[in-house]
Structures are given as C-alpha cells and as structure tokens.
Amino acid sequence: MLDMLFPAAAVLLGYVVLGITGFGSALVVVPLLAWRWPLPEVVALTLLLDVMASLLLGGLNLRQVDFAELRRLLPGMVAGALAGLWLSRSLDASWPLLVLGLYVAAVGAQALRPRPARPRPPAAAPWALAAGGAIGVVEMLFGTAGPLVVAWLSRRLPDVHALRASTPVVITVSACSVLLAMGWAGRLSQPELWTRWLALVGVAAGGVLLGHRWARHVSPAALRKLICGLLVVSGLTLIVHTLQQG
C-alpha cells in the first residue's frame, strides 16, 4: 500500500492540472511515474486514466464543447494515428520530440505576449486536416498530444471556457485511437497494468473534480495565462527530456 503513495500523489497533481486547464496531465504524470515503473507501462496507464478523466471533464462542461472542431480534426487524427503506428516502428523519436517541444513553447510564449489592438485572425478551418494529422502522429509516438491540441484550439476558439471544455474531448478521441493500437499489439494485457489502474482511477477522478471546482474561481484572463504558461513549461520539459536522452 505504501508503494502506491508516490504514484497516487503524482496522479492527483496531474489530474488537478487537467481539471483546471483541460490538458497537461500526461506531461505531469508520465515523468514522475517513470521514476518508478517502465516508460511503456506508464504511457499505457496514463492513457487509460486520461480517457476516463477527459470524459469526466468533458461531461462536466458538455454545453461548452465545440463539436464542430472535433469533426474537422477527426479525419486528420485517424490518418495521423495510422502514420504514427508506421513511424513508431521505424523512426528515432528524439528529433521530432525536440521540434514539438520548441513549437509548443513558442506558441505558449507568443500567446502570453500582450495582444495587439487588432487581434490575430483565427487559424483557417482547412488547416484542421494537417493539425489533426499532427495530433494523431504525436499521440501515437509520444502519448502527449495535449499541448498540440491546445496550440490549435487556442487559434480557433476565442472563448477560453470553450477551449478548456473542448480540449479533453479531442484528447479522448486521440487517446482511444492509440489504445486501440496498443491493444492490437498486446500492450494492454498485463494484469499489473489493470491493478494499478483500479488503484489510481479514483485518485484521478478526484483530482479532476478538485481542479474543476478551483477553475470556477479563476477569471478567463487568468485561465488563458495559466493555459499558455503550461504550454511553455510543457514545451521546455519536452526539450530538456529530449536533450537528456540524446
């Protein structure tokens, strides 16, 4: 039982972040749990927790979800997941991960800058196919497409609450595609994986509910700054991790 205290604390922290911002759980949970368990097992466990937690958060904010954006992204996400499945067998993941970290950090830093008198035009809808493809590839290769989802939706959705509500729904769809591939490859058949999931799923749900309650008391401007700041931290974390691995 004591062996689960550290994992439970890591999961609680990660899903409080998810409850507040709508994304970021994997970038908190995966590095911490990887200190204790093998990384492939951690990624599978985190995706299983993400599906439950993201569905819960999406249900709490269902009226604010922009399903039109999900429909635009879905074809690209499916194609990207298939491409990622092929790339995962033949590609060294270090350089695309470094590029992803640089991109995400740059998007977050740019969004934190004072807005000009004339706001930037939103990203054009036809680019959703490319954005969905990138999300599918990254989720398949790394299991951490959340920052990329936020980077796209923040250019499409001016309402920060719609952004926060729509992000976990998109993450759920991308995570499910990865889990289907993992199940086909036999990576979800270990009994220990499901034992850990049963022990931690309640902690994750509690973290989501706690973060959701705190988010109600945060102004839209502060919430946008928090989301963009987390983008910067997420990107820098990916960069440091990649350089250390190299």
Pin down the residues of each PLM region:
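Interfacial loop-to-transmembrane junctions
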Residues: 209-232
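Residue-level recognition of pore/gate-forming positions within transmembrane alpha-helices
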Residues: 50, 77-81, 104, 171, ...
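Small-residue-rich hydrophobic segments that form or flank transmembrane alpha-helices
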Residues: 4-71, 129-137, 146-203
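Residues within membrane-spanning alpha-helices of integral membrane proteins
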Residues: 44-47, 100-104, 108, 168, ...
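Transmembrane helix exit motif
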Residues: 54-65, 85, 93, 97-124, ...
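Small-residue-mediated transmembrane helix hinge/kink sites in multi-pass secondary transporters
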Residues: 31, 84-89, 151, 211-213
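A helix-boundary/kink motif common to multi-pass secondary transporters
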Residues: 22, 38, 92, 159, ...
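Residues that define the loop-to-transmembrane-helix transition and helix capping
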Residues: 40, 68, 94-97, 126, ...
